Amino acid sequence: LHSFPTRRSSDLEPQVVKKRQKDISDIDQKIISMYAKGMTTRQISETIEDIYGFETSESFISDVTDKILPQIEDWQNRPLDEVYPILYIDAIHYSVRDNGVIRKLAAYVILGINTEGKKEVLTISVGDNESAKYWLSVMNELKNRGVKDVLIICADGLTGIKEAIAAAFPKTEYQRCIVHQVRNTLKYVPDKDRKAFATDLKTIYQATDEKKALAALERVTEKWTPKYPNSMKRWKDNWDAISPIFKFSTTVRTVIYTTNAIESLNSTYRKLNRQRSVFPSDTALLKALYLATFEATKKWTSTIRNWAQVYGELSIMYEGRLPE
């Protein structure tokens, strides 16, 4: 693999050994850092050869990155807070090679806003078995790690999630993610109409109360249904999971539907998709996701804007459920 210069003078020997050990761990760190940026094992191998002038096999690179697997396990099992005011659940899809066949797998990310108003990734799981049974196991895992109560869970229409939340956390409010709702509505709308349609949708979710929101829903449906017949169907079908937002003040709503927190995290995850079209295994995907998460969350030091006001309002609305 690689050789180190030897020195004849025996009194220098211990120093050389120390230096050599340090160099190896230093290279490990560099390999892990490159992997975190989404580079493939082949790209890392080529970069190591360019920089250090020695060859490393792709399996060696893979073995080095496997050293973080115990760390991932510890992180996935770490104790969590008893109460989270808000959780966001999202899915990002990746192509993964499985016994020579390329499959689409989802990485499910749960992001929490804790009682201090700080963001925290609770867990990441990779799978293709989206169902009420699967989501119930995810919810129970959170409970086993110490979570006793969640006020609001925001998620897209993931199969079975609503039922699983109701079973595991009966008092928790399920809120459809407004950003996804809007995105799904506009998905098949051509550019020429998209801006006007998006502006009209805003009149629904930014309405001051539910009555005005329903009136806006009727107006928008009447206006756009002739041109795009199914575009507004999801709003009517999902209304019971969209409407909880109207009981909150603008400040709280902004925290709930301005999903900057999860959107910025997602852009980090999407970068991985751009850098690799296919992951060699679900373990390789999990390693890349964990390292990308670790990099992204290092910058998360600030509290959510207006958190004191948000917390105060949530404390009144969900009486006795938040620590004072």
State each model region's role.
Residues 2-9:
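Short, small-residue-biased leader/transition segments that mark boundaries at the very start
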Residues 22-23, 124-146:
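Active-site beta-loop-alpha junctions of metal-dependent nucleic acid enzymes
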Residues 42-53, 291:
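DNA-recognition alpha helix
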Residues 49-60, 227:
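Short, basic interhelical loop/turn and adjoining N-cap
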Residues 55-116, 126:
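Structured nucleic-acid-interacting core domains from mobile-element enzymes and related host factors
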Residues 152-159, 164-200:
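Conserved beta-strand -> loop -> alpha-helix junction used to position metal-binding or nucleic-acid-contacting
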Residues 170, 203-324:
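Acidic/histidine-rich catalytic cores and adjacent linkers
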